[in-house]
Every structure is written in structure tokens, then in C-alpha cells.
């Protein structure tokens, strides 16, 4: 995000306030250096049991973070609030990611490699992600493009628009995002959807936990195919992308 992060010593204590980034740190071989995570850092499954949980992504316990005495705090522009970042950077070096596409992910990995002296592992991860992407692109060549709406919330209904990582992943999947002309996460009505000639509606399992009951209800109301999809593979960047392309294959049919 164009911020200078000044480190006066090698990093040995990391507080990470974003689930995607926590998982990525572990996959880069840095688990021993993580001292604090959020309650939403669910991967790997044991991480919240062995590290201090300092709150959520929008509200953190600053006293807990202070007791952990971190060398650096890792944040994300979308997940964490400006208030959290500004409060923390008065006391600690803070690195803030702004990830909306694959290139941003690769840049984040490159920066982590430099910050945490793990450039070799970071480079290997980048190469693996790019290889998976290349193979998936080949797989997708024969697929028909579908016009979709990707739901992230209910009451009110909200969908993914442009300038989001989800939108980028929809593009990689060969989907035409019906809300590509709108910014971020617009609110929509079911009446609006009827006029869009959609081929498919995708209901994400996060942040709102859409279930099969929602899927069946919307399908009956709109008469459009509705699929329940794993939101982690559409919205988590970093090492989660390694498994994403295999998951996407299953969505499109092997």
C-alpha cells in the first residue's frame, strides 16, 4: 500500500490480523514466529489453540497485543479498519496488504519473503500458484462463459462487484460478473436480478454462511440455477490459492 515498514531487527514475533495471511505465514514455514491471531484465523485448524487470540478483524484487544510485544503486525486494507492500523502503528511496525488480484498476491508473497527472510519458500509458493493457474486456464478453454451474481450477504442481499479479489477469481473462472460495473459490494434486490438474464447465482459460505436452505429458496423464487460455493476459495488469497484451482475444476465439472 505504499507504506514504508522499518524493521530494526530480525522478526521473531508476528501478530497477524487476517486469516488468509495467517495461513500463508504457516505455509511459508513461519508458524513458530506467530504469537497472535484473530478468532477468524481458522486455518490451520490448530492455530487458535496454540497462539493468542487477540480479537476479530474489525475489533482487537490492544492490551493483549501489547503483552505479546510483536516485532511486526500484519493487517489488510479490506479486513482491518483504518483505526486499528493507525493505533497499532504508533507502537509497532505495521504491514498492510491490499490484495485484489493474483498479481497482488504474488507481490505480497515477495514482500513477506523479504520481511521474514524466507524468500526461497515464497518464490516456490509463487511458482506453484502460477503453475496451477496455467493448468486451470488450459482446462477452462473449452468451457462456456456464464453470467453470474456472487452473493456474500443476506438481509440485505449483497454481491461482489469490481475491484475485489472475488471479482478477479470469477474472471479466472470464466464467469461474467453481472455486477462488474459496480464498485466493491453493492446491495441488490431480487427484483433487480430478474432483469439481468443470469445463468447462475453463486452463494458463498462466507462472510454470510449461506446454506442449502437458502440455495433451494432462491432457486424456487428466481427459477435460476443456484450453487453453494466455498467462499474461502473465492476470497482467500495467498497459499489458499494452491487448492483453489482444483476446487474450481470440481465446480465446472472435471
Predicted features and spans:
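N-terminal ligand-binding lobe of clamshell/alpha-beta domains
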Residues: 1-254
Amino acid at each position: 500500500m505504499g507504506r514504508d515498514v522499518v524493521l530494526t531487527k530480525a522478526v521473531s514475533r508476528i501478530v497477524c490480523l487476517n486469516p488468509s495471511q495467517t495461513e500463508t505465514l504457516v505455509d511459508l514455514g513461519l508458524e513458530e514466529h506467530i504469537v497472535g491471531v484473530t478468532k477468524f484465523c481458522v486455518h490451520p485448524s490448530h492455530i487458535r489453540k496454540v497462539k493468542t487470540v487477540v480479537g476479530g478483524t474489525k475489533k482487537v484487544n490492544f492490551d493483549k497485543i501489547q503483552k505479546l510485544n510483536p516485532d511486526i503486525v500484519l493487517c489488510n486494507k479490506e479486513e482491518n479498519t483504518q483505526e486499528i492500523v493507525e493505533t497499532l502503528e504508533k507502537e509497532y511496525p505495521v504491514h498492510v496488504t491490499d490484495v485484489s488480484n493474483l498479481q497482488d498476491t504474488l507481490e505480497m508473497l515477495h514482500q513477506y519473503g523479504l520481511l521474514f527472510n524466507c524468500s526461497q519458500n515464497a518464490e516456490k509458493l509463487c511458482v506453484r500458484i502460477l503453475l496451477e493457474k496455467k493448468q486451470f486456464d488450459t482446462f477452462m478453454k473449452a468451457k462456456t462463459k456464464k453470467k453470474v451474481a456472487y452473493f456474500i450477504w443476506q438481509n440485505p442481499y449483497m454481491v461482489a462487484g469490481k475491484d475485489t479479489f472475488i471479482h478477479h477469481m470469477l474472471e479466472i473462472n470464466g464467469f461474467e460478473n453481472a455486477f462488474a460495473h459496480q464498485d466493491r459490494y453493492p446491495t441488490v434486490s431480487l427484483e433487480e436480478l430478474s432483469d439481468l438474464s443470469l445463468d447462475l447465482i453463486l452463494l458463498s459460505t462466507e462472510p454470510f454462511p449461506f446454506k442449502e436452505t437458502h440455495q433451494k429458496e432462491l432457486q424456487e423464487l428466481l427459477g435460476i440455477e443456484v450453487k453453494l460455493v466455498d467462499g474461502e476459495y473465492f476470497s482467500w488469497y495467498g497459499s489458499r490459492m494452491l487448492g483453489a484451482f482444483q476446487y474450481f475444476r470440481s465446480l465446472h465439472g472435471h
